[in-house]
């Protein structure tokens, strides 16, 4: 939910891509936030659950799901990848260096096995519109690795460290990238706008006002 609520969607966005869509949650959040946009969700795993979720939602008519690697040749394997996207979002595989799990599905979800960071970067560079944004959420160590992989291609423009409670360390980073553009001064070494978000108060499973404000459109209990 955090990524879908935090990503910098704009009213003018018309095409949005969700990489590693899973159950389609983030894609549907994008459809809710961008009422004029067409959303495409892609995943190497089966997308039938995502399609069912979309069909049961008010936004199903603007959301399509494709079972296909985002690295696919657009002209031959995935016509959905033709053209550019105003916004790309991804909650990609992580734990790059940790041991793989015997369960292949769980391994794919938790490890950068089928979508190495350099291939994700290349796909974003290829598919992102000139003024587009790419939003991603990763554990802190993997976020640093991914930022390094993007140097020379994508510039980090915004970053939010996520803490579960005030006393816990930052566990996740929400990051937004744009195409590096030397002529406009947007470079990989340009300082991003940084902030922190604390999810819970640490008392009786209460959420902070900041987290409630960010996600209230997506939780009935808020």
Where are these regions (language model features)?
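Residue-level signal for inorganic ion chemistry
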Residues: 3, 91, 120, 177
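Conserved SAM/SAH cofactor-binding pocket of Class I
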Residues: 5-102
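SAM/dcSAM-binding transferase cores
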Residues: 169-222
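Conserved Class I SAM-dependent methyltransferase catalytic core
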Residues: 114-170
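Mobile active-site "lid"/loop adjacent to the S-adenosyl-L-methionine
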Residues: 83, 92-126
């Amino acid at each position: 939910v955090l990524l879908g609520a935090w990503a910098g969607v704009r009213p003018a966005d018309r095409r949005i891509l969700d990489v590693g869509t899973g159950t389609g949650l983030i894609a549907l959040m994008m459809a809710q936030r961008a009422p004029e946009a067409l959303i495409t969700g892609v995943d190497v795993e089966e997308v039938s659950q995502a399609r069912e979720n979309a069909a049961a939602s008010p936004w199903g008519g603007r959301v399509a799901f494709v079972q296909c690697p985002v690295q696919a040749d657009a002209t031959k394997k995935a016509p959905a990848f033709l053209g550019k996207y105003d916004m790309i979002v991804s909650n990609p595989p992580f734990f790059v260096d940790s041991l793989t799990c015997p369960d292949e599905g769980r391994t794919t979800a938790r490890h950068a096995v089928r979508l190495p960071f350099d291939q994700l970067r290349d796909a974003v560079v290829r598919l992102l519109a000139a003024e587009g944004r790419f939003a991603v959420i990763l554990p802190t160590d993997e976020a640093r690795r991914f930022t390094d992989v993007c140097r020379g291609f994508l510039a980090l423009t915004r970053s939010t460290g996520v803490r579960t409670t005030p006393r816990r360390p930052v566990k996740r980073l929400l990051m937004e990238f744009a195409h590096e553009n030397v002529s406009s001064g947007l470079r990989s070494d340009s300082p991003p706008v940084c902030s922190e978000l604390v999810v819970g108060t640490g008392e009786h499973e209460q959420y902070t006002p900041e987290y409630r404000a960010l996600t209230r459109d997506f939780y009935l209990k808020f």
